Amino acid sequence: MAQFFKEKANKSKQLSPKLSLNVTQLDHLGAGMAQHQGKVVFIPQALPGERVSVQLTDQKKSFAKAKLIKIEQQSPERADASCPHYGHCGGCDLQHLALDAQQNHKQQSLNELMVKFSGSPVIDPQVQAAPLVSPPWHYRRRARLATYFNNNDKSLKLGFRALSSKQIVPIKQCPVLAEPLSALINPFSLLLARLKAKASLGHLELTQADNGTFAVLRVTKVLPAADIRALASFALTQGINLLLQDDSGALTDVMTMAPAEDEGATQVEQSALTLPEYALSQGQVSCQFTPGNFVQVNAEVNQRMVEQAVNWLDLQVGERVLDLFCGVGNFSLALANRGQNLDGLEVIGVEGVPEMVQQARENAKRNNLANLSFYHADLSADLSNEKWLGKIDKLLLDPARAGAFESLQWLQKMKPKKVVYVSCNPASLARDSSVLLSQGYQLKQLSMIDMFPQTHHIEAMALFEIAT
């Protein structure tokens, strides 16, 4: 049964009375919804079909929030949470819901948003592509853990942020992390607690790449030589690449730091670093990235998502394909690789972060993709007059949560025949879909992507074609 976080009672406030409510549905954040005195009440960890005892925690004019006290009548879709930290840690929020029910909820939420903005009463079943779903556990290849140094007892906590709080929940393992990463959390916690410069440690970022396990430890000051030796010994024993990152963002491999006198250690150039990488296109392409670069955290779903995007675009001889918000080349590399045997096919990747553009160019060079070029640009600006842009036959968009509304205003001048839109926020996808529909495009495929099982987060991808 799910474990519910019990806050300490505020003695200066009189607690509101307990209510017994019937939950009718989930909201887009995965909270149960009920009605009380004409208001919608949002109840985290409550499920549709359940009768629950709750206590109101916040009341607004048109809605209220409540804390779940007891489940009086349980939903058959309720599941036992697999993580001992569930209900305290702020990472997962749907472990109490069976996996198939999670996916059904996400599909329904996506469809409702698309219907709302499209003006269509329903999503055409012929448009509904199969969802891309993930294994329920151990799917995350990347995570950032926070640290907290207690100046009173000189102790250090390592963990994730608590639910709706900046407090840190110390953890020993995490069932949604790739197993090598989960297994590192407790050893890292013990190691960092022993260091002399605990007060100078920031967050810890863990990455499981195809070429090994990487850890980046943020430091605010140069560490003493004894700490460097302890970190280097740990990296060697665990068989990981352990990097330190200073205030400037510079990275240093602890194995290449020569211990100096008491003041610290000597730093080497970033060019000496081994960078994490992952394969695309059934191993035909390798994508390298630096810690801090954005990459999709679910490796298995990313592979299938990229393959589906390439298939949907249906590349042809002589076409020019634009990949906007391209990052380090996640889609561009696969598109260019598929197009190597198509005479005259060209892929152009555009990204707003200069460091990622440089890494993308390195990736194109490493993979010998002569039909691929990358450019740095302000993605909110009109790029239609850029000399390097030219004719665009097909378009791939993979924007951040804010979506691609500004870009779509000038992209209509290019009139690409097909548009694949990959979204980490269905609300902005639905909004931008209405723009594409108004420009003469038709929605041909819509796929829900369950990139983050056990959480409310929904990703999606859609294919639009210009009406003929």
Curated annotation (Swiss-Prot):
**What is this organism's lineage?**
Bacteria, Pseudomonadati, Pseudomonadota, Gammaproteobacteria, Alteromonadales
User: Could you identify this protein by its name?
Assistant: 23S rRNA (uracil(1939)-C(5))-methyltransferase RlmD
InterPro entries assigned: 23S_rRNA_MeTrfase_RlmD, MeTrfase_TrmA_AS, MeTrfase_TrmA_CS, NA-bd_OB-fold, SAM-dependent_MTases_sf, TRAM_dom, U5_MeTrfase_fam
- What reaction gets catalysed by this protein? uridine(1939) in 23S rRNA + S-adenosyl-L-methionine = 5-methyluridine(1939) in 23S rRNA + S-adenosyl-L-homocysteine + H(+)
Keyword Transcription included in the entry's annotation: no
Q: Which family does it belong to?
A: Belongs to the class I-like SAM-binding methyltransferase superfamily. RNA M5U methyltransferase family. RlmD subfamily.
What is the documented function of this protein? Answer: Catalyzes the formation of 5-methyl-uridine at position 1939 (m5U1939) in 23S rRNA.
Query: Which organism does this sequence originate in?
Result: Shewanella denitrificans (strain OS217 / ATCC BAA-1090 / DSM 15013)
UniProt keyword terms in alphabetical order:
4Fe-4S, Iron, Iron-sulfur, Metal-binding, Methyltransferase, rRNA processing, S-adenosyl-L-methionine, Transferase
> Which EC number applies?
2.1.1.190
Residues at the catalytic site: 424
Q: Where is the TRAM domain?
A: 12-70
Kindly list the positions annotated as binding S-adenosyl-L-methionine. 296, 325, 330, 351, 378, 398
- What residues bind [4Fe-4S] cluster, as annotated? 83, 89, 92, 174
A Gene Ontology molecular function term of the record? rRNA (uridine-C5-)-methyltransferase activity
GN (gene name) = rlmD
One Gene Ontology biological process: rRNA base methylation
